[in-house]
C-alpha cells in the first residue's frame, strides 16, 4: 500500500496495539496519503443527531455515559433444552490472541471510540491523561478475554462506563448523562433505523432516525467524497490516525 500510495480504509480495530498504529502514522506521513479506521456507526445520521443535540445544550453539560456491546455467542442449547458453553476454537479469529481475538479488540473498540468522541464535546481530550479504572476481565481457555468491563475518566471529569461480552447479552445501548437530562440510544452500533430517547424534566421524547440505506453506505459515501476531494483525513466524526492511536492506547491499558 505504501509503495503504491494507496488510500486506505481499514476494518476496525486498525491494529492490535498503539505501537502498530503509530508506525502506520509515520508511514502515511511519509507518502502524504489517506488513511482511516472503519467504524460505520460514526457516519450514521443518529450519531450526527446526537452530536447536534449535545452541542445545542439539550442535556446540559456532560457528566457521564455508559456504553455496551455484547451478545452471548458461546452458549448453546441441547436437544433437551440444557444450556452448555461452546468450546473455544483457536482457529476462529475471535478466540485467537495472535489474530486480534477477544471481546475488547473485537467489540470494545466501538464504545471506546464513542466515549472519546462524546468526551471531546466537553473539551479537547489528552489521550495520555485518561485514567482507567474498575477493569474486569474473564479470560477464556485460549487466552482471550470473553467478558470485559472498564471505566474511563477524562481530564474534564467526564466518565464512561464500558462493557463488552461474548458470554452475556449486554445489548448495544448507550446512555449519555448531562446536567439537564440524558440521551439514550438503544442500538448504537448496527441498526439502519434507530431511536434517540431524550429524558429531561420528567418527560420523554423519542426522535426516530431513518437510515434510508445500508448502515455501511453512509461510511462509504463520506469516505469516497473525501478521496474525490483529495483530502488527507476523513471528515468529522470519522477517525483521524491520531484518534486511532489514542483509542488504541486506551485499549492497550484495558488489555494489560
For each predicted feature, which ranges?
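A general structural signal for well-ordered alpha-helical segments in protein cores
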Residues: 21, 47, 111-115, 193, ...
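Contiguous beta-strand/loop segments that form the cofactor/metal-binding neighborhood of enzyme cores
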Residues: 113-191, 221-233
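Beta-strand-loop-alpha-helix segment that lines the small-molecule cofactor/substrate pocket
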Residues: 1-42
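C-terminal helix-rich "cap/oligomerization" subdomain common to oxidoreductases
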Residues: 155, 222-256
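Active-site loop of classical SDR/Rossmann-like NAD(P)-dependent oxidoreductases
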Residues: 210-221, 239
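A short glycine-threonine-serine/GTX helix/turn-capping micro-motif
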Residues: 98-105, 205-214
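Predominantly a Rossmann-like dinucleotide-binding segment in NAD(P)-dependent oxidoreductases
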Residues: 44-128
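Short polybasic amphipathic segments
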Residues: 174, 192-201
Amino acid at each position: 500500500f505504501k509503495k503504491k500510495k494507496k488510500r486506505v480504509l481499514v476494518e476496525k480495530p486498525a491494529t492490535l496495539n498503539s505501537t502498530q498504529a503509530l508506525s502506520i502514522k509515520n508511514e502515511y506521513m511519509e507518502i502524504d496519503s489517506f488513511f482511516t479506521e472503519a467504524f460505520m456507526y460514526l457516519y450514521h445520521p443518529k450519531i450526527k443527531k446526537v452530536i447536534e443535540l449535545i452541542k445545542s445544550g439539550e442535556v446540559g453539560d456532560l457528566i457521564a455515559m455508559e456504553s455496551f456491546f455484547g451478545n452471548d455467542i458461546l452458549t448453546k442449547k441441547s436437544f433437551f433444552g440444557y444450556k452448555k458453553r461452546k468450546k473455544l476454537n483457536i482457529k476462529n479469529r475471535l478466540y485467537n490472541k495472535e489474530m486480534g481475538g477477544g471481546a475488547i479488540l473485537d467489540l470494545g473498540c466501538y464504545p471506546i471510540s464513542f466515549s472519546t468522541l462524546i468526551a471531546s464535546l466537553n473539551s479537547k481530550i489528552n489521550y495520555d491523561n485518561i485514567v482507567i479504572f474498575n477493569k474486569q476481565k474473564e479470560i477464556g481457555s485460549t487466552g482471550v478475554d470473553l467478558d470485559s468491563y472498564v471505566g474511563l475518566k477524562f481530564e474534564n471529569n467526564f466518565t464512561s462506563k464500558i462493557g463488552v461480552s461474548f458470554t452475556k447479552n449486554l445489548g448495544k445501548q448507550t446512555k449519555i448523562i448531562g446536567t439537564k437530562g440524558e440521551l439514550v440510544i438503544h442500538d448504537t452500533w448496527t441498526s439502519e433505523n434507530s431511536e434517540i430517547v431524550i429524558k429531561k424534566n420528567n418527560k420523554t421524547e423519542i426522535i426516530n432516525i431513518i437510515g434510508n440505506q445500508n448502515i455501511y453506505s453512509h461510511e462509504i459515501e463520506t469516505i469516497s467524497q473525501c478521496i474525490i476531494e483529495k483530502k488527507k483525513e476523513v471528515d468529522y466524526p470519522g477517525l483521524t490516525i491520531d484518534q486511532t492511536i489514542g483509542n488504541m492506547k486506551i485499549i492497550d491499558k484495558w488489555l494489560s
